[in-house]
């Protein structure tokens, strides 16, 4: 972490201890902090500043995405994730399945990496195509957090769309 991080955090903690709720409205108000990084965030994702916002945390945002994009219907109930997914990602995925009455044991497909810890795009796409109409969502990382492997998002998305499924990517490590 940058050396200045500790002193910046200490400054905000001191402000909180001395001013409490008034810290939201003083000379450097907390109430508008979410605007400070908009230009950098927009540039990072290729968006306009009015199209981005810093909010929540990674797991909360994943829950929000799953609430919108995991919509099991008919035989289309399965979800594909990577074996060894980040623990909070795994729990978010399985909790959404259970909430919708879907058994993760029967409907969650975990793609395993090879012996070197890398995920084969061919294996992922083959699993997607084999699962076919039963697949509701592919939820994978953009960059796998153990190995740093960048997954082929375009090929995976193409395969998912070919069978009528959504493709979602957690870019927390990207």
Predicted regions and their residues:
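Pyridoxal 5′-phosphate
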Residues: 1-174
């Amino acid at each position: 972490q940058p050396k200045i991080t500790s002193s910046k955090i200490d400054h905000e903690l001191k402000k909180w201890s001395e001013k409490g709720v008034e810290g939201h409205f003083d000379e450097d108000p907390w109430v508008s902090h979410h605007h400070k990084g908009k230009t950098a965030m927009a540039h990072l994702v290729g968006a306009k500043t009015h199209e981005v916002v810093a909010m929540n945390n990674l797991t909360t945002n994943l829950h929000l995405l799953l609430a919108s994009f995991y919509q099991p219907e008919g035989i289309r109930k399965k979800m594909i994730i990577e074996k060894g997914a980040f623990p909070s990602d795994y729990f978010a995925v399985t909790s959404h399945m259970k909430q919708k009455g879907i058994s993760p044991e029967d409907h969650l497909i975990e793609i395993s990496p090879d012996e070197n810890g890398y995920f084969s795009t061919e294996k992922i796409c083959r699993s997607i195509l084999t699962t076919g109409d039963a697949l509701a969502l592919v939820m994978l990382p953009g960059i796998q957090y153990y190995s740093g492997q960048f997954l082929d998002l375009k090929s995976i998305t193409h395969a998912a769309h070919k069978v009528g499924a959504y493709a979602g990517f957690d870019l927390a490590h990207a």
